[in-house]
Amino acid sequence: MKRFLFLLLTISLLVMVQIQTGLSGQNDTSQTSSPSASSNISGGIFLFFVANAIIHLFCFS
């Protein structure tokens, strides 16, 4: 049961990251001041860090 929950959590986090990157990539409008690419990268890195921390908490608990 613990492995099933771990697998479900991992898959849901991967789907969440894919949705987040898809939504941030679709904001291509004709604005004069667009956010830099590093802001999107930092958001992805933060999500990856949170997902990694949660996975390790479940794995080592």
UniProtKB/Swiss-Prot annotation:
Propeptide: 37-61
Topology term for the membrane: Lipid-anchor; GPI-anchor
GO cellular component term of the entry, any: extracellular region
Lipid-binding residues (covalent, GPI-anchor amidated serine): S36
Signal peptide: 1-24
GO biological process per UniProt: positive regulation of cytosolic calcium ion concentration; respiratory burst
Positions bearing carbohydrate: N27, N40
Keyword Nucleotide-binding applies: no
Subcellular localization, as worded in the UniProt entry: Cell membrane
Chief location bin: membrane
Domain of life: Eukaryota
Purpose: May play a role in carrying and orienting carbohydrate, as well as having a more specific role.
Protein name (database record): CAMPATH-1 antigen
Lineage of source species: Eukaryota, Metazoa, Chordata, Craniata, Vertebrata
The gene coding this protein: CD52
